[in-house]
């Protein structure tokens, strides 16, 4: 497929036809999977060549989803945490096989494995630390995530579920601890480090660690599958 330098890729007839086909497929999948809305962007050679929203960002007021709708990214946050850790490693501020307690003296978790090695940063990132999936706090029942203080205090009552490196077990708690290491090694809050060293350099102006009131009108409201 040949495209002249002065022609936008999205204006190419073949590309336009494929985009229309893609849009039809997306709409059919939304119906099949009961998806209320989504946004999609396509980047080619560092240029955004396609961006569009489908469906609704809020079912209650039938607000249309657009290319500017923002979403809670949940566990995709782990990508930012891992990136921050690797940046700090490259800066010589930590090593992946350093024990967690070298940076976080308060990191103490009960264990029934007396000869287990110390938990390392690498194990946090690879879900092989032996830590439970969640912090010892019932936020799944009251929709409230634990604060930093609550997470640290809760560690006193938690127990390793297996010895480090024994197996793989997905752990949100492990990445929360990794975020604390980012803050300690960088000498600044996690949110500040991510914003200065990842989001700003990439021009991710609509991505924030904490929700901003100015984003409220653009934020998609989640819903359970039976509500959609």
Q: What are these model-derived regions, one by one?
A:
Residues 1-7:
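Bacterial Sec-dependent N-terminal signal peptides
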Residues 11, 18, 22, 34, ...:
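Residue-level signature of the cytosolic catalytic core of signaling kinases
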Residues 19, 23, 27, 82, ...:
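Extracytoplasmic/secreted envelope proteins and their assembly/folding machinery
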Residues 26, 40, 46, 70-99, ...:
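Active-site SXXK
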Residues 30, 89-90, 194:
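Alpha-helix C-terminal capping/helix-coil junction sites
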Residues 58, 112-228:
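Short, surface-exposed loop or secondary-structure junction motifs
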Residues 96-112, 201-202:
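Short, glycine/proline-biased beta-turn/loop segments that scaffold the active-site neighborhood
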């Amino acid at each position: 497929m040949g495209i002249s330098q002065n022609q936008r890729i999205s204006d190419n007839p073949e590309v336009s036809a494929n985009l229309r086909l893609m849009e039809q497929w997306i709409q059919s999948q939304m119906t099949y999977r009961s998806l209320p809305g989504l946004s999609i962007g396509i980047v080619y050679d560092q240029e955004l060549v396609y961006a569009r929203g489908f469906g609704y960002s809020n079912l209650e007021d039938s607000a249309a989803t657009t290319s500017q709708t923002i979403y809670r990214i949940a566990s995709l946050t782990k990508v930012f945490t891992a990136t921050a850790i690797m940046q700090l490693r490259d800066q010589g501020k930590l090593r992946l096989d350093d024990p967690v307690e070298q940076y976080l003296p308060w990191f103490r978790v009960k264990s029934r494995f007396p000869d287990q090695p110390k938990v390392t940063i690498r194990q946090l990132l690879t879900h092989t630390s032996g830590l439970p999936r969640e912090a010892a706090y019932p936020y799944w029942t009251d929709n409230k995530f634990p604060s930093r203080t609550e997470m640290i205090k809760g560690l006193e009552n938690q127990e390793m579920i297996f010895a480090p490196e024994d197996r793989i077990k997905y752990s949100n708690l492990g990445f929360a601890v990794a975020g604390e290491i980012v803050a300690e090694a960088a000498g600044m809050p996690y949110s500040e480090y991510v914003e200065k060293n990842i989001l700003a350099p990439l021009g991710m102006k609509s991505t924030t660690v904490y929700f901003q009131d100015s984003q409220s009108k653009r934020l998609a409201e989640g819903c359970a599958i039976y509500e959609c």
